[in-house]
Amino acid sequence: MLDYIATGALAPAHVEAIVSGVCDGCRQAGAALLGGETAELPGMYADGHYDLAATAVGVVERAKILGPDRVQVGDVVLGLASDGLHSNGYSLARKALLDPAYAGLQLDATLPGSDMSVAAALLRPTRIYVKSM
């Protein structure tokens, strides 16, 4: 795994907390955080704003690559139910939940259909499914 953190002004305690969370996720997935980049970009980000990205790369032996030639009638496909928004759903969720043109909720409001606040729902970590398989 490689990570990337960008911000307008580095706050070492915040960066340490972010990297610690990434390391926790790596441990859950049985992956290693091999490196990454931390960028201070005052012209791009306001103080206190962060951009976080990560890339995971795996290796598989050529003989074990799953392709159309290895799929047969009777094979089973497993599906796991999602338990939240996950990494790619937050931009749309923020817009739908917080924008007055849509739901217009406040961060401290209870998320409809749940017992948690909108803020708590938006801050839930993405589930790592590796061990579920």
Ranges and model annotations:
Residues 1-133:
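Helix-biased detector of long, well-ordered alpha-helical tracts
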